[in-house]
Structures are given as C-alpha cells and as structure tokens.
C-alpha cells in the first residue's frame, strides 16, 4: 500500500520510532542491488531517513556514485519501505546530528572517525502498519 510520506498515519510514525533494524538497498556500479542490515532514523519534519556508516563501506561508495536507496523495516506482518534519492553527507555537524538521533533510537554508536551519513530524501513510502481486519478480504 502506498502512503503519503508527508502525512504518515500515527501507526506508521510509531513503527518508525520503535527499535527495529531494517535493510538498506543501494545499487552497485554494475546496477545490481546491494542489500545490508542497518539501523536508521526517521526525520518527519524533513522527510528524510539517515543511516550512519563508514566512508569506505560499499553502501557509502554506492551512494557517492549517485544511487537511489530504499530502507525497509519489517516486524511480523508490519512493514514500511522508504525510498528516494540518497546523498552522502560528511559535514561534522551533520554527522553529529545523525549520531545523536541514532543514539536516541538504538544506542550510542561506537567511535568512528570515518563516519558519514547516508541521507534519503523520501519521495515514496510503501507499507502496511495496521493489521487488516478479517472482513476486509
């Protein structure tokens, strides 16, 4: 089901703040998907997803080469995919902000002097976060 990323229902917002891992999909230079487990944060004011990683990671290199990205969070029957163009941010202030958000959702990230932020400007949301009723079927 497609959702309006600017007006996510309360159940979707709650799902995005619960402590879950997700997958991040980017494209390799040859066009094949690269899918890895990640922790991420959602910024509803700016409609962006942030993932922290090392500058030398494959996902960071894919994004630096100009990749769209998708984060998909799944828990039981509930799921959300957040898609959009992705850019690599290395400004120290951006990295600190992303680390702070990550720590609030998960835990304090370990020190990493090569840390960068992958920022997805969400332009499409797909998902199911409220269990369909038995009569809807």
Region locations from a protein language model:
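Charged, gly/pro-rich active-site loop segments
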Residues: 1-7, 77-137
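Short, basic/aromatic recognition patches
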Residues: 1-23
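A generic local structural motif
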Residues: 8-11, 35-37, 56, 105
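Short beta-strand segments
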Residues: 19-55, 69-72, 82
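Generic structural signal for secondary-structure transition and capping sites
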Residues: 20-21, 68, 107, 125
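An amphipathic, aromatic/His-enriched active-site/gating alpha helix that lines ligand/cofactor pockets
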Residues: 31, 66, 109
